[in-house]
Amino acid sequence: MVPQVLLFVPLLVFSMCFGKFPIYTIPDKLGPWSPIDIHHLSCPNNLVVEDEGCTNLSGFSYMELKVGYISAIKVNGFTCTGVVTEAETYTNFVGYVTTTFKRKHFRPTPDACRAAYNWKMAGDPRYEESLHNPYPDYHWLRTVKTTKESLVIISPSVADLDPYDKSLHSRVFPSGKCSGITISSTYCSTNHDYTIWMPENPRLGTSCDIFTNSRGKRASKGGKTCGFVDERGLYKSLKGACKLKLCGVLGLRLMDGTWVAMQTSDETKWCPPDQLVNLHDFRSDEIEHLVVEELVKKREECLDALESIMATKSVSFRRLSHLRKLVPGFGKAYTIFNKTLMEADAHYKSVRTWNEIIPSKGCLRVGGRCHPHVNGVFFNGIILGPDGHVLIPEMQSSLLQQHMELLESSVIPLMHPLADPSTVFKDGDEAEDFVEVHLPDVHKQISGVDLGLPSWGKYVLVSAGVLVVLMLTIFIMTCCGRVHRPKSTQHGLGGTGRKVSVTSQSGKVISSWESYKSGGETRL
């Protein structure tokens, strides 16, 4: 938004010059001339456009854009990122503990983010604690996982508000734009699925602080409002106005680009989608005051001329030029034909350039055609010079015209924020690198017995264990077989039913070989 503030000083606002300020007014409709006495002469009220007979003025209040330079409508916000911190510990056979930290992300909920932000703003001491990693627990020969879910708040994160559709513009949004802020949806998605953007103030409308209340006078006829006199004293017509919302506030965009919010009973059409309004700045406001002062000065000059006419009982073309209405609308036109003072009802329109009313030498265009003169005299002090050129007294006075040109040059449209990206995105305009964390519950998970080996190592260990068990089994079976073999032999011999006995050298009978062996050994 290239906001600079709208001030619309339309002295001839409602004229069909579409934003151009007039340098002169001339009748586009001129009634029949009738003779009058000098006492019927009067000075027009140039501060009110007496169009359509709306001469009833009543005080009222209206809302307009604030005066002051607005480079952009800034909305302070913050980003909220969901982070899961995982601490994994393993304790081996001898009690050695290994800890590994990992981080993952998750998409946070708006309510949790708002609560975390409120903690931060309130200076809750739990924030300092929540910045730490989860405290790791451990168990012998086991892997223990401890996790914490944290909400990382980064602020400030500033976005630009478009007053026309209340959309937000920032680099953090997908495609640079967010249109989802409503009463039911109070956040914007960002370029990351696990990060959302939220305004610091849940009521987004409070960020659009660009309006001010003013007092003026409503011009109406019956129940119809034709226009109003603004707080600075200038009349603004509602002819050609259309309805337009700014920051969700319904108002009227006038022909000169002014935006006002006021109650009217007339049915007004909506403005086209691409219709913009002008800004209101101090410079334009100052020029508008100068224009009002100039109009007041012109009225004083008119009263002086009228007083001179009454005192001298004489009228000149130059004095009659002071009685011309300076703003569009209904008024009077005066002239002198054959030494007779004449008056006619007229409806004045604005003129942008002198060529509009003097297209060629000797031609004064009124109502689309060259107006006839009477002995070189037109009206309102306009005469035909000796060289055949049309002479208008106001062509010699350009002060009011200069004010209007200055005013016109100061009117700047209230544009969309991305119309000039350089005014929105500046180098180094990034959020400060500080983080506040909101950590809810801590989750702990304990695994089964873990020897700390990789998956292939576990298979090797199991295979080796099986092999060792098999070898031990074979060894035990072998040993047991050797121990039981002699008993098996003895049992076999007894099974034959034969008994072997021998006689020793001493003549003693030995019943068996074992007895003999033991007896022999004993004697030995």
UniProtKB/Swiss-Prot annotation:
Which topology term describes how it sits in the membrane?
Answer: Single-pass type I membrane protein
Subcellular location field: Virion membrane
Q: Which residues lie on this side of the membrane: Intravirion?
A: 481-524
- Which Pfam families did the record assign? PH_Rhabdo_glycop (PF24834), Rhabdo_glycop_CD (PF24833), Rhabdo_glycop_FD (PF00974)
The Gene Ontology biological process terms listed for this entry are: entry receptor-mediated virion attachment to host cell; fusion of virus membrane with host endosome membrane
Q: Which residues are glycosylated?
A: N56, N338
Signal peptide from the UniProt entry: 1-19
Disulphide bond pairs: C43-C302, C54-C226, C80-C113, C178-C188, C208-C247, C242-C271, C363-C370
According to the UniProt record, one GO cellular component term is:
viral envelope
Q: Tell me the residue ranges located in the Virion surface compartment per UniProt.
A: 20-459
Q: How is it used?
A: Primary surface antigen capable of inducing and reacting with virus-neutralizing antibodies. Almost all human and veterinary vaccines are based on the functional aspects of the G protein.
Superkingdom as given in the UniProt entry: Viruses
Q: How is it modified after translation?
A: Glycosylated and palmitoylated by host. Glycosylation is crucial for glycoprotein export at the cell surface.
Membrane-crossing residues? 460-480
Outcome reported for the amino acid change (mutating I26V): In strain: Isolate Germany
Q: Where is the lipid attached (S-palmitoyl cysteine)?
A: C480
Additional note from the record: Arg-352 is highly involved in rabies virus pathogenicity. Its mutation dramatically attenuates the virus.
Family classification: Belongs to the lyssavirus glycoprotein family.
**What function is annotated for this protein?**
Attaches the virus to host cellular receptor, inducing endocytosis of the virion by using different host proteins including TFRC, GRM2 and ITGB1. In the endosome, the acidic pH induces conformational changes in the glycoprotein trimer, which trigger fusion between virus and cell membrane. There is convincing in vitro evidence that the muscular form of the nicotinic acetylcholine receptor (nAChR), the neuronal cell adhesion molecule (NCAM), and the p75 neurotrophin receptor (p75NTR) bind glycoprotein and thereby facilitate rabies virus entry into cells.
Record's subunit section: Homotrimer. Interacts with matrix protein. Interacts with host TRFC. Interacts with host BST2; this interaction inhibits viral budding by tethering new virions to the cell surface. Interacts with ITGB1. Interacts with host GRM2.
Which protein is depicted?
Glycoprotein
Give the species.
Rabies virus (strain India) (RABV)
Lineage summary: Viruses, Riboviria, Orthornavirae, Negarnaviricota, Haploviricotina
